[in-house]
Amino acid sequence: MAPIKVGINGFGRIGRMVFQAICDQGLIGTEIDVVAVVDMSTNAEYFAYQMKHDTVHGRPKYTVEAVKSSPSVETADVLVVNGHRIKCVKAQRNPADLPWGKLGVDYVIESTGLFTDKLKAEGHIKGGAKKVVISAPASGGAKTIVMGVNQHEYSPASHHVVSNASCTTNCLAPIVHVLTKENFGIETGLMTTIHSYTATQKTVDGVSLKDWRGGRAAAVNIIPSTTGAAKAVGMVIPSTKGKLTGMSFRVPTPDVSVVDLTFRATRDTSIQEIDKAIKKAAQTYMKGILGFTDEELVSADFINDNRSSVYDSKATLQNNLPGEKRFFKVVSWYDNEWAYSHRVVDLVRYMAAKDAASSKM
């Protein structure tokens, strides 16, 4: 199969992480051709600086430099990564105005956070792209895919705008998938994600009229917040629809988060049985997506872990009421930047393979 022609709209935190995940998997210029990256600036020197120096993830494994597309331009507008040229394109208010067709881009990774509605994201298709992957929860009827859970539902003929869900849904859904697949069942559940701060938060107390607590300084506070991650699991695992809800606590760490799911099973079981089932899944049908640890680990130990969800058997609890055999707390870690970005790449590859197979039929 020819390299997948990809464009990244929005070269901020997640856009860059997705690009770095492509490089980390050894796909750049081989299986994936990143034709262009789009942002408000086209300053390739600044992009190269950001990619070379990452506070959390460190130095890249690839070479990166910036060059001019022609002597007439003021600043370098082309990234050269491992010898492969990537054009830096100026952002547009309307995705339909981006030159995807002219550039030969087939798959757009929409990572601005602005075009998460299906109708708005379809602007990329009007601009010449064939498919769009939104690196966030989407609205307006876009198909939501969580790799390892429901990717088989992707239809080349009908799914042109696809959401990769959220990083938290990508952590929670694999755990819930195993619990339901292995017949533990979920009668009801409450999820809390202890989530590292993100770029949308404030470094010092600032204005946030829609979310007063969200306007407080991120690096010195534990901030309660909302999340739709638990409810979104019902979109990819229909048997849990309406059974899960949750909230978030934003905490003063720059990366890595952890999901705490307290649930009631539909049958009697034990911690040992749950541990065994999840460990087996992590080694077999969920390998590479779900991990298992029985070590005494902390959040920093999961930086750059590309698995969506790493179950912590040391933190699993069972209600200690006499005779209670259905009430449990399970805990799973995730690098909310790195693992999620790898799943975006996996989803693009999966879609491209299915699309190619469909076109031959």
From Swiss-Prot:
Pathway assigned in UniProt: Carbohydrate degradation; glycolysis; pyruvate from D-glyceraldehyde 3-phosphate: step 1/5
Query: Matching SUPFAM superfamilies, A to Z?
Result: Glyceraldehyde-3-phosphate dehydrogenase-like, C-terminal domain (SSF55347), NAD(P)-binding Rossmann-fold domains (SSF51735)
Q: Where is this motif: Microbody targeting signal?
A: 359-361
Q: How would you classify this enzyme at the top EC level?
A: oxidoreductase
The positions annotated for binding NAD(+) are R13, I14, D39, Q92, S135, N336
Residues forming the catalytic site = C167 (nucleophile)
Q: Where exactly is the site Activates thiol group during catalysis? A: H195
Query: What keywords sit in the KW lines?
Result: Glycolysis, Glycosome, NAD, Oxidoreductase, Peroxisome
Q: Which GO terms describe its biological process?
A: glucose metabolic process; glycolytic process
Query: Binding of D-glyceraldehyde 3-phosphate: at which residues?
Result: S166, C167, T168, T198, T227, G228, R250
Q: Give the Enzyme Commission number.
A: 1.2.1.12
* Spans traversing the lipid bilayer: none
* Localization per record: Glycosome
A GO molecular-function term, please?
glyceraldehyde-3-phosphate dehydrogenase (NAD+) (phosphorylating) activity
Taken from the UniProt entry, a GO cellular component term is:
glycosome
Recorded catalytic reaction(s): these are:
D-glyceraldehyde 3-phosphate + phosphate + NAD(+) = (2R)-3-phospho-glyceroyl phosphate + NADH + H(+)
Name the SMART domains on file: Gp_dh_N (SM00846)
Could you describe the subunit structure of this protein? Homotetramer.
- Family membership: Belongs to the glyceraldehyde-3-phosphate dehydrogenase family.
Protein name per its UniProtKB record: Glyceraldehyde-3-phosphate dehydrogenase, glycosomal
Q: Which organism is it from?
A: Leishmania mexicana
